[in-house]
Amino acid sequence: MGNISSYARTIRGVCLAATLRQGKFGETKISVRAVPGWDAAAVCQRFGGGGHPGAAGATSRLSLEETVKLLEEYILKLYEFCISYPWPEEWLLGCINDYKITDKGELENTPWYKYLVNYIRTMIQECMEKLEFAIRISERPDGPYMYGEMLEREKEMLEDLLKGQTLDFYYQAFEKISFGRLPAKKDDTVNVLCREKVQQLRKEVKKLLEDIRETYLLLSPEQVTERMQTAAPHVETLLKLVISYKEKLDEKKRKENIIDFHDMEHFALNILLKKQEDGSVTASEAAKEYRAYFEEILIDEYQDSNLVQEYILKAVSGEEEEKYNRFMVGDVKQSIYKFRLARPELFLEKYHTYSNEKGDLRRIDLRKNFRSRKEVIDTVNTVFAKIMRKELGGIAYDEAAALYAGAVYPENTGNESELLLFEKPQKEEEQNARQTEALGIAQRIHRLKKEFLVTDKETGNLRPVMYKDIVILLRTNSGWDEEFKEVLAKEGIPAYVAGRTGYFATKEIRDVLQFLRVLDNPLQDIPLFGVMKSVFGQFTDEEVAIIRSSTEDKKKNLYLCVKEFVQEQVLRAKCQAFCEKISGYRACTSYLTILELLQKIFTEYDYPAYVAALPAGEKRLANVEMLLTKAAGFEKNSYYGLFHFVRYMEQLDKYNVDYGEAGTLDESADVVRIMSIHKSKGLEFPVAFVAGLSKKFNMQDTAKALVVDVDMGLGMDYVNPDMRTRSKTLRKNVLATKMKLDNLAEELRVLYVAMTRAKEKLIITGILDNFETKIQQYQKLLEHTEKSIAVTEENMTGAFSRLMDTD
């Protein structure tokens, strides 16, 4: 097996080594690279065009728009989930069987059903805590005592609800829930704020219970079973399409001698483990060889492991032989790769079951933080002690989870953490919210440069802060980083946008790709709007608004509005010229290669000269040249044409197969770094701005027609194509709820990672709309909220997003 040092590598490296060692590829030379779903469009075209029985029926059940792109999206999404499971086909077939339930008894045994019953009980308990808080307020000397009797009766009603164990029980019990009117008795000795707080809490309880009924209890278990049976054949068709797609993709990779990162893991898994007919898993001879060879297995960043990796690690360790030689290191509070289907639950299961006493399965809590000053650590502990709960994220921020200062720093002043809130500009055309926040940060950086000292890494002494000591962390770079960079540049502050995925976000590439999307299909409003505002259209916001408002049909495509615009003569001529350009380029796509099409566009618009004249023009020009290189290389593969190139680039962007911006930055350069929180993981900076906290959480996936969970399968809307109606199903609602809570838990962990990047000073920033009103509301919240109120989905969503109600 070679020297032991050769196994100090990533788990995928170990998987590849194991695969090659077993002669998986013989003498064949293979290429290891990320393979996005770049040929899914062609596969879906064949299926959607009648190549697979029932394909159209599957999409019509899922959505009223029977399009290849929709089918492609579903197949790629389900493929992504299945390959995160140790045996992908087994997962897909399990999802099919999940829908083939025959009665209420089988329904009650499904994972999503059990999750729902537990979730309803948790929400009722939340209502109980709110009512108990209201009762305590009513019992105060200045409290609304006249409400006490009714509140007690309502508390008894909730106690009865907590006895429920089945959906059938709750379906019937919620039909009988009723709230009377609070007594109207007036008493001047009652504190007005106390009265309002009790009324507010009771209103929240009523709304929460009504939401539960509307979301989960409108159909009886029998009706739920019937709808699942109706959907079963369409689910089966869709999932068999995924199996077919996987087979075709695997075949294509074999022909081209390509393996991707998931292949590495699955090849290694199948070498190390054997699945028996009864479903059990046994170690292979190869696994036993590894067990005998490895004395210890040390795993770093264990919180980011997935289920496939867990099986592999377990296979090569000696646990089955009672040889406990796995040492797993990680911090579940920093597990921020759920979108890559990491399983923090693996870490949590061990965290909650292993004892901190000496033994075979022992947990060792590494509490000391050797990065940050006490001021930073105190801020992190204060915030997360209030918002991180076991119910949301699987871990309570208690003494075992809290940070303790271990770093030694020279005495200094001004290290207190700061929360900077900026008022949202009233006139967006003058300055948008992001620019306002960036300007506020720039002004704070100017003051830091004048007065703040940091500890020099080499000497250990204090010195004036430099630009390179400062980082601005963003939840997402897209749409934020370049704007921040431009504002800082105007303020005379050098800045650099760091990030592997900067290529697709750059203006020069984004504008071209939007233009190609429009040439592929002009009836796409969002790309078309971007093109109209770019150098390819040169329309102003006011002109687009005039065109958009020229029709009373609000559902009309923007392209048709442009094409049919007949009002102002000058603008009409501009619209006609724009449409003629698009039509001309669309005609060229039938005989020009992608490279030739791009060269034609760039020549006619003098695009390289335009790009070179922009700030950082040399780098931007290199990005454009890189796009031409990629276009030339694309058509050497199996697929041709604009449609496939657009899909190819979309998949590269979606699956983070990015090239990074052309050019690099010297690490010693004295510039402010702007980067995503994910990019910053593992890094540290003397001064960290955590910016953009007014940005709302992205919950778009929970509202889509198809939602997927690796443990609970898939849920989808119930669509009647004949009646052209759509309604949400119970299963989809449950999966969407779980997804939403998982996303919120992930947002908690992302915030934790961001705040713990700071070594000496932490500054948190955000934008407030209706500044004075929001500040007053926040003060009231602090004055009249008890710590005992649990952090639920609704409360957590409001932590920043509801308070800072901006997009």
Which functions belong to the PLM regions below?
Residues 218-229, 245-251, 255, 422-428, ...:
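Short glycine/proline-rich turn/loop motifs
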Residues 31-46, 243-248, 667-668, 740:
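Short, hydrophobic/aliphatic alpha-helical segments
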Residues 80-114, 118, 142, 214-218, ...:
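Conserved motor-region signature of P-loop NTPase helicases/translocases
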Residues 75-259, 361, 439, 458, ...:
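Conserved ATP-driven helicase/translocase motor core recognized via long
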Residues 694-704:
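Cytochrome P450 core scaffold surrounding the K-helix E-X-X-R motif
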